Amino acid sequence: YMSYLAKNYNRKKISFKYGRGSYLYSTKNKKYLDFVQGIAVNSLGHAHPKLVKAIKNQSKKLWHVSNAFQIPEGEKLAKSLCDKTFADYVMFQNSGAEATEAAIKVARKYFYSIGKKNKNRILCIKNSFHGRTLAAIFASGSKKMTEGFGPKVPGFDHIVFKESKPRFPKLRSKIKKNTAAIMVETILGEGGIKPIPDKCLNYLRKICNEKKILLILDEVQCGIGRSGDFFAFEKSKVKPDIVPIAKGIGGGFPIGAVLMNKKAASGMIAGTHGSTFGGNPLAMAVGNTVMNIVSRKKFLNNVKKSSKYFLLNLNKIKNQYPKIIKEI
């Protein structure tokens, strides 16, 4: 078998014909329970009837139009996101990496717009994950991700997160005069599936207020209902300035977005950022459908209920096999 795809993925020798709900069906007619879900993407499973209907209906009307014009479907989704969250404004993208890059631009442009042109550094957690684009991998601070992609993209500093010392003891010393923002994943992904404790998130907010810098909470992977709340940071009552999202908001369709409060968004005037495909009518029709379902209390309560069930029973299995399973 000759593949003409680049070798940047170590693909398993299995392919699928179709999916239904939580199941995938292979080209060899095997049924699989899909625990991967496209890596935190298929928030409503495979081929959800309402998503199929939304794509079908919108595809008959309009797929793409330039952002030089108003897009009602995008206006609707932006309003829903703002009504549900801390945000005052939304910029649509196509992926998580795009959303992260845009979040960095928003933070830097804000300070530039108020006359602080040298205030542009972003403080991140070492070995986090913010995407695969050039700035994003250097924001992540992982040698594994950045090796071979030099020269180093400047503008990023790093702190270490340890569960034993969740309050970032060296945080204050890492914030310089030219620091513009702190950017962290609310739940570390590549860093080991480690939630940032609520007290720690509140501490970050306090420090950002004190130092007059912005707080960016990356919810690309942990947001859109995965934690049982619409955003994972909601339980902490913290209000960030900027939040990049993607993955689950599209339910399998490429959608990303940056949510911003009025202050953070003030520098983003016409011409400062753009996306050819971001916010297109077809994507927005899908996003509105996902939003209508995932934002409901009943849906989120079911996530919490399912989470308790899995934690209880997975811990039972862990206790049975302590040498095999280290942590749940």
Predicted feature locations:
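Conserved N-terminal phosphate-binding loop of PLP-dependent enzymes in the Aspartate aminotransferase
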Residues: Y1-I328
